[in-house]
């Protein structure tokens, strides 16, 4: 599917009715990890763009929607690890603590998510805006056998819509369940998981050609011939080994 080009001139172009709404785990495992490992992507849907080359309102794409970019981190100082996040009109400033992104099956740590807020002006006297960036990076470096790789990160950028009395440090992301550790140490990290085990959260599928309702996704007809009025819904089972392994060889 990598041959399907959904990005034109740095702008995401999806067919009518399609939405790109990935989870944190999908962004890290299916896109960022494959990009770092130079493996085929599920689709050419995320453009490469240095997000610090332009102010957030000048980045390619629709300002009213979330925008995704593969970007590289430029060191602020020659021998330092801090990233240079200055733009023409301001700078991106990290807020809160980095959050671990874990797999929904196995709870394996696959990446880290950093939240940044855009400030207009020069530090430390810049004025805060409502522009938010989620910067995803892998939790571990690729194996040395892969050779030198670029310092890729995946960025999600959007304009936060303010609602009354919300915490200023709220990153506007409600996709995942968050489990906070009460430890107040400076290296505290929140864990993000996409697993939902509560039966109430399972979708209910209705087969309008049958009288029974199926609430268990694993309940399938024993034989196609046993019910000629079946809706024809099939279930695909994916192995979690490709997602949970830390090696880039899983994509080859």
UniProtKB/Swiss-Prot annotation:
Keywords: Activator, DNA-binding, Host-virus interaction, Nucleus, Repressor, Stress response, Transcription, Transcription regulation. The keyword Repressor applies. GO terms for biological process: leaf senescence; negative regulation of DNA-templated transcription; response to abscisic acid; response to salt stress; xylem development. Induction: By abscisic acid (ABA) and salt stress. GO terms for cellular component: nucleus. Residues 165-194, 217-252 are annotated as: Disordered. One of its GO terms (molecular function) is DNA binding. It is found in: Nucleus. The keyword Nucleus applies. Disruption phenotype: Accelerated leaf aging. Expressed in xylem and phloem cells in roots and inflorescence stems. Highly expressed in senescent leaves. Expressed in roots, and abscission and dehiscence tissues, such as axils of bracts and abscission zones in cauline leaves and siliques. Residues 213-226 are annotated as: PEST-like. Pfam families: NAM. Residues 110-166 bind DNA. Residues 180-194, 219-252 have a biased composition (Low complexity). Residues 14-160 form the NAC domain. Over-expression of NAC083 inhibits protoxylem vessel formation in roots. Interacts with NAC007/VND4, NAC026/VND5 and NAC030/VND7. Interacts with the mungbean yellow mosaic virus (MYMV) AC1 replication-associated protein. Transcriptional repressor that negatively regulates the expression of genes involved in xylem vessel formation. Represses the transcriptional activation activity of NAC030/VND7, which regulates protoxylem vessel differentiation by promoting immature xylem vessel-specific genes expression. Transcriptional activator that regulates the COLD-REGULATED (COR15A and COR15B) and RESPONSIVE TO DEHYDRATION (LTI78/RD29A and LTI65/RD29B) genes by binding directly to their promoters. Mediates signaling crosstalk between salt stress response and leaf aging process. The NAC domain includes a DNA binding domain and a dimerization domain. This is NAC domain-containing protein 83. The gene is NAC083.
């Amino acid at each position: 599917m990598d041959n399907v080009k959904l990005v034109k001139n740095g702008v995401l172009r999806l067919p009518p009715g399609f939405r790109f709404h990935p989870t944190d785990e999908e962004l890290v495992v299916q896109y960022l990890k494959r990009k770092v490992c130079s493996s085929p992507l599920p689709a050419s849907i995320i453009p490469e763009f240095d997000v610090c080359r332009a102010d957030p309102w000048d980045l390619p794409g629709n300002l009213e929607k979330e925008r995704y970019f593969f970007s590289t981190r430029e060191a602020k100082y020659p021998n330092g690890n801090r990233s240079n996040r200055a733009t023409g009109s301001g700078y991106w400033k990290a807020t809160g603590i980095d959050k671990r992104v874990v797999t929904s099956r196995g709870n394996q740590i696959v990446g880290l998510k950093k939240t940044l807020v855009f400030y207009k002006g020069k530090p430390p006297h810049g004025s805060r805006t409502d522009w938010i960036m989620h910067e995803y990076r892998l939790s571990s470096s690729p194996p040395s056998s892969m050779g030198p790789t670029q310092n890729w990160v995946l960025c999600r950028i959007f304009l936060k819509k303010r609602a009354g009395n919300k915490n200023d440090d709220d990153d506007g992301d409600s996709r995942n369940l968050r489990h906070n550790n009460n430890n107040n140490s400076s290296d505290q990290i929140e864990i993000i998981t996409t697993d939902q085990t509560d039966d109430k959260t399972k979708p209910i599928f209705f087969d309008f050609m049958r009288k029974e309702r199926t609430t268990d996704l694993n309940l399938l007809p024993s034989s196609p011939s046993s019910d000629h009025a079946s809706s024809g819904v099939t279930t695909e089972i994916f192995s979690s080994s490709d997602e949970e392994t830390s090696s880039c060889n899983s994509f080859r």
